[in-house]
Amino acid sequence: MGADIGFIGLAVMGENLVLNIERNGFSVAVFNRTTTVVDRFLAGRAHGKRITGAHSIAELVSLLARPRKIMLMVKAGSAVDAVIDQILPLLEKGDLVIDGGNSHYQDTIRRMHALEAAGIHFIGTGVSGGEEGALRGPSLMPGGSAQAWPLVSPIFCAIAAKADDGTPCCDWVGSDGAGHYVKMIHNGIEYGDMQIIAEGYWFMKHALGMSYEHMHHTFTRWNTGRLHSYLIEITAAILAHQDTDGTPLLEKILDAAGQKGTGRWTCVAALEEGSPLTLITESVMARSLSAQKQARCKAHRVFGSPVKVSKAETLSAQQREELVSALEDALYCAKIVSYAQGFELLSHTAKRRGWTLDFSRIASLWRGGCIIRSGFLSKISAAFAQQHDLENLVLAPFFAEELKRACPGWRTIVAESVRQALPVPALSAALAWFDGFTGAALPANLLQAQRDYFGAHTYERTDAPRGEFFHTNWTGTGGDTIAGTYSI
């Protein structure tokens, strides 16, 4: 009898997923382009387990039970297409190919249609949780050929992380590229979460003058409350970690952040949908700005520090604790906004593409295994379960009340950061979005007047029904013709 599933790609994530699958009672056949990697894996971590090695893709396919299921964990992009091109002639109708890499959702849509035309099922699945999650239980977000889900769901649900209530952090997301799109949104939210935490740390250090030990204890305390999450937990651990000389290691880590591109994909998707993803976009741009280390140092030599004396030196213990409490409010509010914007983008795309998505279930998939896992997600899941047509997360009764209560502290932190020249792009962008979203009137009326003035783009009037458009001859020398192809 053949192996339950085949696996191509034995980097650390691939190896760990294979071991996870085998540990949960399934047999696996594996292949890697560099075949010595297969031999090393079989002689080492896979020794004595129900894992069989192959030295060619043809051999791998021959080792599998029908219908054959092959999961790819290779670098996103052309490498995925190259492997699919090699596999396709060896497969039969009804077989299944699964892409578990960080592929762009539009590539997943293209691949699914191409393989379905040949009678082959295709699933693109988001895998979150890093190396440890792959081994112990990741969050899985599969989408693609719906008929294929029963073929792989027993394996996926077995290896996935389990939430506190025992529910697998895995479920069918939706058709064509929905799985990878949801993973992209997850990654964008991850960028946002990380940035607001970094801004909180920076405020503690520079506005409040807190020691690393004090910051460590504060984040540890926060992790027992409403900010409880994996990222808060590891931040507390990072702040306590010392270098070999006994000083905080964080002091020696260069402030130039890297990124792999999935955050940018989320921002581009938001621009394409016209969805205001301000917090996540600023979080991506903050990394880009940080990477300009040499230019920033040059600018610092030119402009110096705008604030000569830190307020931290004059704070009483009570004032410092009040600001720490306000900072907790700020991080909490911004976190709500990050998810609100992420799910709004998801909603816009789902409507355009005809995806039927269960936002409550999607939020629950992230409760365990993944990088953004937190207790907070149960509240989001409940909000969407109670109101399936919820227009925006901030309008859910629970989150609306939380924002009303915590908003004053949020404003305090953003205002104090501006006064002390501390950049908080994510916290401030989130607040600006919140004020705009909750504002019944905005200055966009002037924008429309300007557009009509120079381009005859027309405008709607407050004293006329929506959908009725007007044009004004602003200078007396124009005309009554409205804009055609020219627009801005």
From Swiss-Prot:
- Which residues hold substrate? 102, 128-130, 186-187, 191, 260, 287, 451, 457
Question: A Gene Ontology MF term for this entry?
Answer: phosphogluconate dehydrogenase (decarboxylating) activity
Residue ranges spanning the membrane: these are none
Q: What SUPFAM superfamilies would the database entry show?
A: 6-phosphogluconate dehydrogenase C-terminal domain-like, NAD(P)-binding Rossmann-fold domains
**UniProt record similarity statement:** Belongs to the 6-phosphogluconate dehydrogenase family.
Q: Which PANTHER family match?
A: 6-PHOSPHOGLUCONATE DEHYDROGENASE (PTHR11811)
Q: According to its UniProt entry, what is the function of this protein?
A: Catalyzes the oxidative decarboxylation of 6-phosphogluconate to ribulose 5-phosphate and CO(2), with concomitant reduction of NADP to NADPH.
Q: What is this protein called?
A: 6-phosphogluconate dehydrogenase, decarboxylating
Organism listed in the record:
Treponema pallidum (strain Nichols)
| Gene responsible for this protein | gnd
